[in-house]
Amino acid sequence: MFKKYKKIIITLLFVLSSISSYAFRLDNIIFNQRIDGPDGGYRESYIVNDSLEKVRYKISVLPGNEKDGSKYVQVYPRVITVEPKSKGVVKIYAKAPSSIEKGEYHFKLQFKPIVIPTLAKAKDGKITGTANIQISPIIDMKGYAGEIDFKNVIKFEDIKVENNLNGKGIIVTGKLSNDSFAGIDFGAEAYGFNDFFYGAAYIGNVEKETKNKFIKLSFSQIKKPSDLKKIIFYRTPSNKREIIKEITINQ
């Protein structure tokens, strides 16, 4: 029995050490774009290589677990090489016919590692080939079909603006609702007198039919609550900025 558990522990340690030593990271890995519009939906994501070695991945589109939209999705490049301490761009495009049923459509992206052999010198001076073990993540993603006026379905209520007691700047809290049939990810911009821009904060993904989700935004550039006059919610459909909602802060 002890040998059995010892083998499991050793295996887990090996896997954990392989994952932590191979610095694979995905940024902006959310889609949430409309796929049945005239131009379809487009989003750029990033593979970040924090290691000191070159990495290469084959990217595949797989069926989603729920309403499958994988047949509408293309990804470029299909094989990507990322140099050490750099990042590579993954372009995701989805185009569905205008006749499809409205709602969310799911798909997955698989990042399968391609081993890049390297040469290493052993203690005896011999040159041998080596290869790193890499993780192969599969990411769930989704888009949607149908017209949504996010300006009317996104609500931000019970707003409070306070000093940040744990640091500089201010904290804005409130309850966020998304009354639409699709998830959305977006950010918030803070403005002061005469539309002076203080900075932005990323809100993240808000699922469909979300009710009164507690949101906390930090703006370190604002000295006191009375300096905040306006918050703008925005998103980036097909990498273009679109204002969702403008909220005046009355203090």
Describe the role of every protein-language-model region.
Residues 38-44, 88-89, 102-108, 168-172:
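Short, solvent-exposed loop/turn segments enriched in Ser/Thr/Gly
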Residues 1-9:
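Bacterial N-terminal signal peptides that target proteins for export
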Residues 50-68, 111, 179-195:
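Short acidic, flexible loop segments centered on an aromatic residue
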Residues 10-18:
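Bacterial N-terminal signal peptides
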Residues 23-48, 77-79, 153-169:
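Beta-sheet-dominated interaction scaffolds and their linkers
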Residues 97-148, 225-251:
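Terminal connector regions
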Residues 71-99, 196-224:
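Intrinsically disordered, low-complexity Pro/Gly/Ser/Thr-rich segments with frequent PxxP/GP/PP motifs
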Residues 25-28, 46-93:
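Surface-exposed binding patches on compact interaction domains or structured appendages
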